[in-house]
Structure formats: C-alpha cells, structure tokens
C-alpha cells in the first residue's frame, strides 16, 4: 500500500524550472517525442467504438482507452501495470497518458512549414535572400531553382521556368543541379554556411553607405546570428516528419444516434495522412513526374492547412462550409489557448446571485443566502460532521446535508464564522472589483451588500449580479483577511482619496441634519451637551435645525499622541450636536459645524484616516451611514412637481431673445450680415438666454424668505427638496434642474451641428411633438456612444495592463539623484492643480531650500506627507524636484523611493507591489467616463480662440522667463523671443497665473513690476505676425524690385499704399533667386550690428509680407518693419476624451506636427524646390549644418538670421512625442505625456495620480537604439532593451572598455507590449503567430520575469505574496541548494504574510 501511495505521489510532482526556451524541432527530436508512426487515416471503429490500429487514435501508440486495461481485455487491474499486451500491443497504464503521448507521420516528401514561409517577414526568404514569390513558385511546383551551378553560367538560387530548365538541360546535361518543391529549398538551406555568410555580410555592412541596404543587411545578420547562437539548423524549417498531437487533445466523441462530434484537427490530420499515403504509393509505382508533382503540392497544401489554415489561399472548409480550426487558430485570439484557458480560468466553489442593500451590515460583512452558503461550504460541513462524530462516513454526512437536518445549520454557522468570502462584480475594472467580506447568513436568495462599498464596485441595486468565491486554503483565507478585506481598502489606489464615501441617501440625511433654519423651534437655547440636544429633539421640544449653544468637549492629539480634552460653548444647531456623538475622539468640532455636503463628508473621512488611522475610520464610516439613513428617512425629502419652481422672469427673457433674433433676421435679409454670422449670433443669443433663465431659476430655488424671531423678514437657504438634493451632492446637478424648471435649451442635429431654435419648454411644462422629436436624437446617441465607449475603454485597459504587467517594486532605494521638477499646473489665470497635490506622497530627489536662502527646508530622500506639504505651502515653495519612476535606475523593476507612497495604504510602497498593473487599472478604470467624441470647433467657440491680450486676475508682480525684448519709441517693451512665459507672482512668491506671450507683443508692464487685478499687461494683433527691428537706424531695401519681388497695393478705404512681397511661385523667372530683405544702416550707410553679435541687422521677408515703410526712412528699435498675415488654421478638430488618451499612449504622430529645431544655431533658407522650402540651421561652433525640407504652406515662426536653440518650435502645431524625446530628453516627454493625459481626465473631473501615468511612460521608454556599439556585442542601429544596454555598459566600464552609446526610443503601448523580452507575454497579447515564429527562429529563452508569463506557466506571480517565494527560489539557486518542495505549510504562509504586512509598518530587516 505504501509504495502505491508513493507511486501516486511521484506522478503528481512537477519539475521546477527557471526559464522556458522555444526553438525549432529537428526531425530526430520529433521522432524522439513520438511513441509510434500513425500510418492510417482511420480513427474509431464505428461499431465497437474501439480505436483502429495505426490510426489517429491508436491505443498501441498513444496508450490505453481505459485505466489500467489493455484494448483486447487480456490484462486488467493495477497489478499488471507496465505490461505490454502481446496480443494488441497496448501498454497497461493510466489513460491520461493519451493526453501527453505524441505520434508522428513520416512525410514522403519534405514540406515547408508555413509559419516560417508566410509569416512576414518570411524567415526562409530572409535567410536565403530570395523574394517570397520566387520561393512560393518553387514550393508549389511552378518553377525550378538552381542548387549547384557547377561549371555552367547558371547562378545558385537562380529561378528557372519549365522551358528554361529544359533548355539548360539540353545545353549542359547533368553539369548542374536544379530541383523544384520543398526538397530544393531544403537542399539550399542545408548547404548554407551560416558563419561564413555572417562574416561576408558584416564586411558588406562596413563598406555600404545606403540606408536601405544597411537596414536589410542588419536584419539578415541578426537572423543568421540568431541561428548560429541558438543552434537551430535552417533546414529544420522544412518538415520531413510531422508530429501528431495526443488524441485526448483532439477528442472524438460519439453522439447519440450514431454520429460523432470531432475536433477539426482530426479532419486536417486525415487529409495529410491520405495524401501522404497516396504519394508514397505513387513513388513506389514510379508514377509520371507530373502526377507525383501534383500530389506533392497537395501534400504541401494539406500540411499548410493543418498548421495554419487560411494563411495561404482559401481556407479548407468542413462539411458545414466554415473554415476548419487549425493548430495556429487553437492558440491565437480571444478563444485561443492563451487568453481562454491560461490567463482566465473558471473557478470551483463559486456562486452568483442578485444583490440587494444591507443597510444594517457592518463594513466588513455581507449577507449570504443560507442555501448558497450550504452549497459553497459543503466539504467543510462534511468534515465538521465527521469530526464531531455526528456522521460516520462522508456518505452519511452527505445524506444529512441533503435532508437539511437541524444540526447541519449549527455546523454551517460554525464553519462560516471567521471564514471570509470574496465578492466580485463584473466588469472588474480595478482591484477593488474583488473584495473580501465575512458572510452573515440570511434568509432569501439575494446577496446583501454594504452600501458604502458600492462606489468601489460601481454597483447599484437595479438587478446587478455578483459572484461569491470561497478561499479554501489557509493561505488564501489569510490573504483575503489581511489584504482584500473591505475594511483594508478604504483609499482608492488611483488617487489616494477615500473610496468608501457615503453617497445619495446618506449624504442627504447628513446634509438635512446639519442645516440650520431661522426661527426653528427651540432657537436660542443653551444646552449642557449633545446628549441633552438629542433628548430635546426626541421629545419634540426642539427642531433639528434650531440654532442653539451647546457645551462641546473636543479631544486633540498632543505631541506624544495622547488625547487632551478641551471643553467650550459652541454656536451650533441641535442636529450638529447629535452628529458629534458619533465622531471619534481626536477630530475637531469644526468638522461637523457646517452644512455637510458630499465633499465635506469625504474630507472628514480622509482627515479621520490621516489622524487616527484605519480602525476608527471604519467604525466612523459605518456610524455615518446608519445616522445618514436614519435622518434621511426622518427628513421626508421627496420630489413633487411643485418643487420645480419655474421663475416668473422666464417668459420675458424668452420674448426678449425672440425679439433679438428677429432683428438679426432682418439685418440678414437686408444683407448686413452673412448667413454664417447670423447663425452664430442666433445661437449665442439663445445660449445667453438659457443661462439667464437658469440663473433666475437657481436664485429662485436657492433662497426663501422667512420671518425671524424679531418678526422681520430674513432670507435663508431654501429647504426645497430638489435644491437640497443638488446642493448636498446627493443626486442631480444644476444642469438637470435647469431642464426640469428652466428651459431645455439648444439641441444638436445628428451631424453634430446645433439647431438654431431651442426647446424653450421644460419638463414640468412638458414638450410638444416637435420638441420631443428633436430631443430623441441626443438621447439615442448617448446610448450608442456608451456601448462603443465601453469596448474602447476595455481595449485601452488591456493594452495598458499588457505593457505594464511586469513592473514590480524590486528594491528599497537605488540612490538615484535624477528626478522630475514638479510645479503647480497653471492654465491662464487659474491654478488647476496646486503643488501640494502633485508632490504629496513623493520622495524628494534633492534638498528643498527655503526660497531666497540657502537653508534646507526638506532634506533629500524625504517622503512628503501632509505635514511636509503644509510646510512647503507656508514657505511658498513653487518647484520641488521629486524622484520618479521614469528616472529610476533599477534594472528590472523600480525602487520604492522612486515610486513613493502606496496610495491605497498611505505609507511608502512595499517591495513586491505590482505597480504596473495598479497604474494600468487606475488609468483604464475611469475610461468609461471619458467622452468619445472629437470636438468640432465652430460658432461661438472659435471666435474666443483668437486672443489678443493678457488680462491678469489677481494682484501681484510680473515675472518673465526666457525673454528677449527691445524698448520701442514710446518706451514700451516689445517681445522679440519665441517662447516667452509671463507669470504672476503674489506677495508670498507663489505663482498664481501663467501665460504664453507671442512674438511682437507689446507689454504695458515690465519684468518685476506690480500690477493690480484685472489690469491688461500685454497686447498683440492675433491676425498678423510683425517683424520687429532690434536696432535703430535707417531702412535700406535690398532685392525689393517692383514687379519682380514686390508689388504695390493701395487700400481702397484709407488710400494708403503698401508693398507686398510676392511668393516665389508668383515671381517672374528673374525674381526667383532674389531674396527681398530690409537692412538697417546708420547715417553713414554702414551696416548696424545686432547687439551682442557680429551679425548685421538684416531682416529677410517671406512671401506675402506687407511693408508700410519707404526706402530710407528712419526707424527706432522695437518698431514694426513689416507684417506677415497669419492664415488662421481654419476650424481644426480637437481630439478629446478616450481617443486622445489612446493616441498619447500609442505615441502616434499628429497629422501636421510642429517642426522643431534639430540643433542649435542660426536659421537660413537654402534653395527652394517645388512646394517645399529648404531650412538650414548652421551651428555657431562651425560643425555641419542641418538641412530640412518644409512644405511651403507651413507657417514659420522664425526669420532668416535668427538664432534658435535645439528643440525650439520652428513651425506651430501639435508636438510629436518622439521629437520631444529626441530633442528635449526623457523628462520633457514625460512631462508632456503626463500633462496631456491629465488634461483629458481633469475635464471629466477624474483624479488620477501622476505616478500612474509615469509608470506607463517608463514602459514606453523600455527600448533604446544603439548609435555606436563601442566594445559591446550590439549591432549599430539595433533596438535593444534599455536595461540590457545599461547592464552591458556597466560591465564594460568596469573592465575599462568603451561602452555603447544609444538613444532612447519611445514606443506606443501596443508596440512596447509586443517588443517585450518575454515571448510568452507578447504571444498572449497580439499577433501570436508572428511572435512565436520570431521567437522560435531565434531560440529565445523566456526568463519568466513578468506576471503574465508566470500565470501562463502556472506558478505564483513574482509580486505581492508570491514575491517572497520567488526571492527564496533565487536565493536557494544562488546557494546551490536543492529546490524546496513546492508545498508551503500553513505556518510558512502566515509567517510570510506577517512579514509582508509588517514590512509596510516598520520596514523589514531581512534583505
């Protein structure tokens, strides 16, 4: 018996492995896997249902059909195991060997493997350096290929048609060797000398100069080297033996009625075997060449179909006209092996049901129906029943449970106590979509859910369903309790704010409770404390809203963390005093002494968590909920039609608007305004009228007039139910109330244009048929949009998770000094995001100094928590350099200091945290809230876009950065630099506003001057770009010849004449090469130099420039010499919402990107070509100039002779992230992507921490291109993993050699996922065939570093609680110990969990 157990145990243990290698299989290898050759296409005998011998299901090859029983029945039972029956030849063993034993087919003629032939780029084609078409013609027997030229004039690999071959045969006889079919290709591959070829190509690479040739050569060298290094032989890409999949993986199941259901693979295999056998017979008979050839072609096609059906030609179809599923189809796509079975599996011990509210539950509980619990916990109940001796056997226990005896329910109670269950609601968009709860048994059939976790699940009770899972092992229960319990997930991992926040009823209840009311019952009383307040309210002697004085005892934490009591009399209301009873000790009374809206409640919970920690917060949240529900019920707030008060003014506002519209209509008919202007004006009028109506309505709802105690009238905030719901943030918004009681306003047509007659009615008045019809479009579009949005958002999340899945925190501190400069986000006149929000929870990269001094305010490597941020604000610091994931130097993963605070826990992040996945979920989860549309700018919006001045909002002093300016004749500053920024600094030195100032703007105030709020500080003409002189003197025209380069135009209205420079297209032949310019000379006619340089002041004029000066006029610096009209860019669509985020992460180039200067230097224009001009930048140090062709229609921001810095904008447009990376570096591109993504989310009011976006950017910057290989093994121009280059360079520099130089690459997230080092991860993402083909040829090893690879091969992931296991494995391997038995005991699990949890508190000491 013992050895039997040993035998069974030995069967279950799997090998431990560190990596997975994929390579080409040699024919011998295939034969070594095989247990026999499949010779017949038969499958099962349809009468006996026994497999046919030598067929596709043969028991002799693949193993017995029944456990421990041979086919003929001679040997049965376990005692014969291992015997091979002499009659039927079947080995007596378990039947599961039919899942692992393979067979093979000896092919009568070699066959090309379609993956290496047709998967682009074709590996066979690249290796032989032959075009794919030629190879195909050879393989499918259309032409011959020369294998050995011999002494003839035929080249090796030359393609010959049938006629050419016959001619050559006549001419040379058997001097040469030419064949067709796969044999020919096989012969060519066999005769290749890879190493010699490699040498030859490297020599060629050094000699050649052409870019395309280099690219092609590098590709071939890489492929050849891969073959040499991996030990793959090229001829193995041609199959001579075909492996046969084990039969249980391609089952054949008899249905009732004598028919069979079968896997498509069986059909495909049968085809191959049939054709192969026919070919063998033809060869034995020495049939005519043409017949054999045809049969060989058919065999090739059959094998192609088996490997990848439909890749070449038409797909082979089955009986029902649908293409058969080949081996390639089995693994790729959503239904393939990777995504269907390896990355997502179905789980046992689970149930699902509808959810309902459980308002009486505690936060860590959920209500579980008894029926469900009984079913889910069955094994536990059986065990307990046996343990108690209530049932003798499992069978008896089963009977008891089925009969539902009374004792079973008692046992169930015991089993369930302290055994958490997991609740999951699909779609699980972030990690809070699965949380653990303690079950409470309930009657009924619906799961009860705690109302506060609804926000995290995004659940409501209109029929949502949820799934329950039972964690079985002790470790699983421990993890569920310690990490996944709902009470441990109070903060959202996306932004670190509480996610357990009351909403709807609870908010309304608390708001109602904390409102005050003039002259309420009991006003003016003085009470001894909250208890008395409650007594008075309960006995009906005082109203909840009465303004009273109450004695309140507050507790405050002192320096030692002790609570100190402080009692005082507070002006407050009865309701607030009652609410104070549930507030935990340690919070100030001011927290509840206000009308509590949703924001205030959220802030209250956040403060509680930061001051008092987790436990009090959880208890407080529960109390808030119970109280809120109770008082919401007491309030009796409900919606009646009379609550929607329509303002009296509405009628007159609308009639005024109608009168204005009629007036504009008259103007249009008399031809004073164009149709477009009329339309825009009408829409503006109605939009304004709508705003006026809604303002009147809100004013009306907001306040009511009441009589106070002294009998005077007094205004107070209204108790209108609808208004209270909106004001508290419980439900609804001003915009929705406007539709109920104001007017519905303007509607859009299906094409997106606005209908100029608005819906003047509201929902209380009701809509007429036309109005109803107009509004149906918007409603329907909303629904269609939502459906599209969900799919797109899900796909974005999938790509993000895929690119970031292997990023894990792997060490505590790498000691990087690099970092990102953080400044507040300021757009125009308002601070969109203050500095504290951006740096909270980050680690400083260098000491932060007190502004204006050398005192250190915050030392380097400090985790900035709330108190530090307060300190920064007090000292008005407006820039802090913080560590960032993008600049972290850790090789694989990142260090904890570069990441900073774990947002969901509030302390520095632990090692082993999967920050990549968290980042992906945080960005993807709000994706469904983003809009899908692109904004068409037209009408009112476009006119506001052309700004012409800067008006500041606050008072303060002006600060100009990177500015060049001159003073004009009237003493004002004129800006002559391109990217000038104007900031407004308040008296504390904080930046309040920030504006871009264009070239040629005239400043009213200089740098450092004080301004008052509302003052205009800069003006410019938005429609023309001036040319400003920087020196004083006399104007001298050069090359300005009337009729050739310029033409005179006279303005009809003013009679002034001006010169217009002709575009080179409009000039005569003689004027083509002339360069019209204005030169500034002094009184003696000598050139005036530009100050600070030795360049004469000469201003070249582009085409269309307008000059309003005459030759020889005197001018002074800062004057306008010429004006260049700016064509406004027309109406450009702005991509917004989800598509914009996807574009940023995919790093797509915009349609017309900004042109940036590649190097620093002086701009000049070279010879023009048709439609393009040549921009030349000459560096000051005299190195090679840089040239670029720019289309004529691009508006340039620079003049000839101007100096530009590398990365400056030469022509406006959206900037391409690749250019930013190349010219301004990693930090600039990070800043760009983070800010752009945040802009989209900020518009929708979604808060996401910058960290998450930086994590994705780090993954987009994973690759680098080698510029110069140095002494390394890399090829020039090769794209390699950035960490590999860093490691290689470190080793080279340690040995005193020259490292490789490289440039960082920015890849889109899809590209980056496919370019990962792990082929398993890439194959399970997209383009499975291509990835696997590439990996096999290169003989890639997958080191199983990421999470996805480990999930696929079925072991613990190297993150979270699995991190310790992997670290332990690494340590053991380094020490050379035997790998430990994989089973982890319960004690180990609890110990490692404790260690993980403590690491967060005190930091673990075992490194």
Curated annotation (Swiss-Prot):
Cofactor(s) for this UniProt protein: Mg(2+); Zn(2+)
One GO cellular component term noted in the UniProt record for this chain: DNA-directed RNA polymerase complex
Residues found modified as N6-acetyllysine: 972
Stretches that traverse the bilayer: none
Annotated binding of Zn(2+), by residue: 70, 72, 85, 88
Keyword Acetylation set for record: yes
Gene Ontology molecular-function annotations: DNA binding; DNA-directed RNA polymerase activity; magnesium ion binding; zinc ion binding
Catalysed reaction equations from the record: RNA(n) + a ribonucleoside 5'-triphosphate = RNA(n+1) + diphosphate
Keyword terms, alphabetized: Acetylation, DNA-directed RNA polymerase, Magnesium, Metal-binding, Nucleotidyltransferase, Transcription, Transferase, Zinc
EC number in record: 2.7.7.6
Cofactor note (record): Binds 1 Mg(2+) ion per subunit.
Single GO biological process annotation from the record: DNA-templated transcription
Entry-linked Pfam families: RNA_pol_Rpb1_1, RNA_pol_Rpb1_2, RNA_pol_Rpb1_3, RNA_pol_Rpb1_4, RNA_pol_Rpb1_5
UniProt: Mg(2+) binding residues: 460, 462, 464
Xref: CDD domains: RNAP_beta'_C, RNAP_beta'_N
Quaternary structure note: The RNAP catalytic core consists of 2 alpha, 1 beta, 1 beta' and 1 omega subunit. When a sigma factor is associated with the core the holoenzyme is formed, which can initiate transcription.
Family matches, as HAMAP family: RNApol_bact_RpoC (MF_01322)
Function: DNA-dependent RNA polymerase catalyzes the transcription of DNA into RNA using the four ribonucleoside triphosphates as substrates.
Family: Belongs to the RNA polymerase beta' chain family.
Name assigned to this protein: DNA-directed RNA polymerase subunit beta'
Species name: Escherichia coli O6:K15:H31 (strain 536 / UPEC)
Gene name linked to the record: rpoC
